[in-house]
Amino acid sequence: MTRHHQPRKGSVAFSPRKRVARETPRVSTWPELDEAGLLAFAGYKVGMTHVTALDSRKGSPTENMELSVPVTILEAPPLVVLGIRAYTKTTYGLKTLTDVIANDNLDDELSRKISVPKFDDIEAKIEELRNKIDDIDEIRVLIHTKPKLTSVPKKKPEVLEFGLGGKSVEDKLEYAISILGKEITPQDVFQEGEYTDAIATTKGKGVQGPVKRFGVRIQYGKAARSGIERHVGSIGPWTPNRTMWTVAMQGQMGYHKRTEYNKKLLKIGDESEVDLINPDGGFVKYGFVKNNYILVKGSLPGPSKRLVVLRKGVRNASKQVTAPEISYISTTSKQGV
């Protein structure tokens, strides 16, 4: 039998492991869909609970049986489309061509985040945008959140850029014009049973040693008797006489942007159904859900109160959308769990 060799568990694909510069996640990849519409939505992480749902997976040993499924709850108040952004392709990538910012129906707290123009002729700017359609290669929308409607103790909204679906640039532009200055709910973007990608900033854990950070083995034998166990036994060879950047060492752990693929949406509820999920005393370190909410199967990155972006899946072409049958949602108190 061969000797098991496992010098490390941490992947160098995530280097450098440093704190993210911006807690609000930035989406760099968008799926290409023919149907006009938003490709993402954002919500605040509330906490976790469990539901009892029917297993609809064909060929599963538990097919058509009820299972206890862990779920994460996101509070998803309406998002406001504050602007349209047009891009043109250059040799250096996409470059912003022009922006059109709405001047009505925007949150009063938006001025805490950006400088909002007050007297813009929107119709003239939209017509100018239509005249530049030959120079436009990509259309996206700017949206802002409404955290003051939730139990998150903040008023300043986040501003994000979301991609659009559509067969052509003209279709994307007309759809963006139709929703400019309007509120968007999660029901307008997703449907129950759909697979999405969750993008968020993970929990920060500060500076940690190589054992916790990379999963290296704790020293044993003579090395352990020296009194120092939680360190790397060798950080490199005699030649080349330098330390490689791939060597597991202590450093920042957590507070990184991460993407988790194919997270299934089990339920999308509105504000009239919050009693179905709110436990006695509210959720730990969050409070009560007051708005639209989304139940996502499994766990999501980040602590409670952190913004999570749900993007339409980029790897789920073969997955069918079937609304799950939920018979029970646990509302037992989460205090002390």
Curated annotation (Swiss-Prot):
Listed Pfam families: Ribosomal_L3
SUPFAM superfamilies: Translation proteins (SSF50447)
MF-aspect GO terms: rRNA binding; structural constituent of ribosome
One of the record's GO cellular component terms: cytosolic large ribosomal subunit
Domain of life: Archaea
Chain segments carrying region Disordered: 1-26
One of the GO BP terms on file: translation
UniProtKB keywords: Ribonucleoprotein, Ribosomal protein, RNA-binding, rRNA-binding
Biological role: One of the primary rRNA binding proteins, it binds directly near the 3'-end of the 23S rRNA, where it nucleates assembly of the 50S subunit.
Subunit composition and interactions: Part of the 50S ribosomal subunit. Forms a cluster with proteins L14 and L24e.
Family note: Belongs to the universal ribosomal protein uL3 family.
This protein's name: Large ribosomal subunit protein uL3
Organism for this UniProt entry: Methanosphaera stadtmanae (strain ATCC 43021 / DSM 3091 / JCM 11832 / MCB-3)
Gene expressing this chain: rpl3
